[in-house]
Amino acid sequence: MTKPAADASAVLTAEDTLVLASTATPVEMELIMGWLGQQRARHPDSKFDILKLPPRNAPPAALTALVEQLEPGFASSPQSGEDRSIVPVRVIWLPPADRSRAGKVAALLPGRDPYHPSQRQQRRILRTDPRRARVVAGESAKVSELRQQWRDTTVAEHKRDFAQFVSRRALLALARAEYQILGPQYKSPRLVKPEMLASARFRAGLDRIPGATVEDAGKMLDELSTGWSQVSVDLVSVLGRLASRGFDPEFDYDEYQVAAMRAALEAHPAVLLFSHRSYIDGVVVPVAMQDNRLPPVHMFGGINLSFGLMGPLMRRSGMIFIRRNIGNDPLYKYVLKEYVGYVVEKRFNLSWSIEGTRSRTGKMLPPKLGLMSYVADAYLDGRSDDILLQGVSICFDQLHEITEYAAYARGAEKTPEGLRWLYNFIKAQGERNFGKIYVRFPEAVSMRQYLGAPHGELTQDPAAKRLALQKMSFEVAWRILQATPVTATGLVSALLLTTRGTALTLDQLHHTLQDSLDYLERKQSPVSTSALRLRSREGVRAAADALSNGHPVTRVDSGREPVWYIAPDDEHAAAFYRNSVIHAFLETSIVELALAHAKHAEGDRVAAFWAQAMRLRDLLKFDFYFADSTAFRANIAQEMAWHQDWEDHLGVGGNEIDAMLYAKRPLMSDAMLRVFFEAYEIVADVLRDAPPDIGPEELTELALGLGRQFVAQGRVRSSEPVSTLLFATARQVAVDQELIAPAADLAERRVAFRRELRNILRDFDYVEQIARNQFVAREFKARQGRDRI
């Protein structure tokens, strides 16, 4: 009727075998007995005993029979008893092959779980579709081997504890056999709480925490555990598609990257660190793993998301909810650290946002090291010979959340999560088409490469360890950025933001965008399919129309031809899209500003160019990721290679620099970076007469007020730099320049810093004027071409 999942003859040929049958119904026992009869017929000289495996959390009395079977004196001799093989066996029930999405959702209803059918359903399955029933045998182990493991890893001493240990090992072996049939996406840690609480390692650490108890640690493990179920895993893709229903149903992958990651995950456990722009990211990663039949990830999320029915459902599909602000709870920190180490040791994959929270500006935030340090501790402690840090780039053609981000930038409060919030979030996804979701997997970073071998020097040097963690995390983030494709949304938004509310025609949009596309092609930067379509007028029209109706572009159709512009109230929303592509133009923008600075410099202009390029890199380091200093200089030199003998022309200065900039395509600094320096300048202006140790909240409030004044006066080009989000990093820049701390010369240095920023903004004006000259010349040439037709 059924066949075992594994070649059971390989594990039941021992002279003396105890079969532990994990059954829930008489039907399952009948199937196992039939399977066992086949084994006895194949191996008539072998002895096969069968015992029903006690269920989890069984009372002590239920273990009596197993305790007796494991006693050395139970067999003909103590030695033969220790050589006895233990083989766990179970019946697994497969879902129907043609199950629909509705069928996956219906599995949540009582009595509809296809993996755990009732006895009546089991008999019907055996009559109508017997292939859905499979007898699986877990990996065998000798009693002596199990007893040695028990003594080495646990603190227990009683023979009943040994029986419980054997039961857990049997269930774990069956779980491994089960996911080999169901697929790697069903792989998940089991029995974490009893395994950890029985661990000698865990108990020893617990004893070192004053006031810590096993009971309290157990409650924390219950809070962390995923409560995994097959039905919930099946629902991951269903819920993921529901949450992302406004996007194209098929995610966009790089198949070569997927193949490389699959090979890497077969060799080592991994932490998948994803870029975070939307709450949708939390479902994109699990769905991406399922789409590509890759092992699942166990994702960390804030416990604020564990509400209503979603909390239990997300927990059972692999979400690990963690508390916030755990610095004053040494027991919770210890339990969390050991939990992470246990999961890694068992070769399961973890995942969280490398940024720690959603980026509400569209650009990547600095990496957070909290959970990463726990994984590093597990590696350095020898719990794995290597752990891979797999970056995941997730980007979108559009997001509905940008409206919330724009309000937040203007000073609004964050909307609290809850059932109403969830309803509105999912509802918003279906209001219109948001385009594609792009998922990229750059080459993974090896923890061994950055931290050295386990038990190495870093275990004794916390400062060196933290520095290595920072370098490792920045490398992951850098690779994520390099793999992130440039989207049409970002390019169109960047262009329209530079016009400051002036509308452009389709031809103007199309002609102007070509320089950026040429640059991306020369640099071999990854671009989205939507960006590739910008080569045609139809592709530009589609991109502009997709952003129209205030999302965040306005289209005007009342004249001879349609025109598009960004209204002042939509600038913050458009900036999110623009910011998502800055990484591709960051270094070339710095080149332009350094050239503009060199034109006004006295003495060696080449030296002034390089000094200003490095200075701009230093000022922008809190907003953007950069290559290390050596690589950055090499990249800048490569950017300058577009102009032959550039150092000679730069040294001449004057009109030569004008010509160099006019010949450069594209000129991007005004579009990409001006707003950040305007935000810095607003904060610097506030600091002129602010207290030396002004607090962050007071500084932000004053900057918002002054920024609104500057907008009204036209002292900044738009309302975009008046943003709490930009002021937060502007304050970091000020702190780094030692401008928010008492000092004798503080007032003078604050004035000097403001003057420096104003000079940089003057350089922006200079480059912008040349860019406008390029635009006018391009339009004149295009008009001549149209007139000749």
From Swiss-Prot:
SMART domains: PlsC. Pathway: Phospholipid metabolism; CDP-diacylglycerol biosynthesis; CDP-diacylglycerol from sn-glycerol 3-phosphate: step 1/3. GO terms for molecular function: glycerol-3-phosphate O-acyltransferase activity. One of its GO terms (cellular component) is plasma membrane. The keyword Membrane applies. It catalyses: sn-glycerol 3-phosphate + an acyl-CoA = a 1-acyl-sn-glycero-3-phosphate + CoA. Its EC number is 2.3.1.15. One of its GO terms (biological process) is CDP-diacylglycerol biosynthetic process. It is a peripheral membrane protein. A motif (HXXXXD motif) lies at residues 276-281. Keywords: Acyltransferase, Cell membrane, Lipid biosynthesis, Lipid metabolism, Membrane, Phospholipid biosynthesis, Phospholipid metabolism, Transferase. It is an enzyme of class 2 (transferase). InterPro entries: GPAT/DHAPAT (IPR022284), GPAT/DHAPAT_C (IPR045520), GPAT/DHAPAT_LPLAT (IPR041728), GPAT_PlsB (IPR028354), Plipid/glycerol_acylTrfase (IPR002123). It is found in: Cell membrane. Belongs to the GPAT/DAPAT family. The HXXXXD motif is essential for acyltransferase activity and may constitute the binding site for the phosphate moiety of the glycerol-3-phosphate. This is Glycerol-3-phosphate acyltransferase. The gene is plsB.
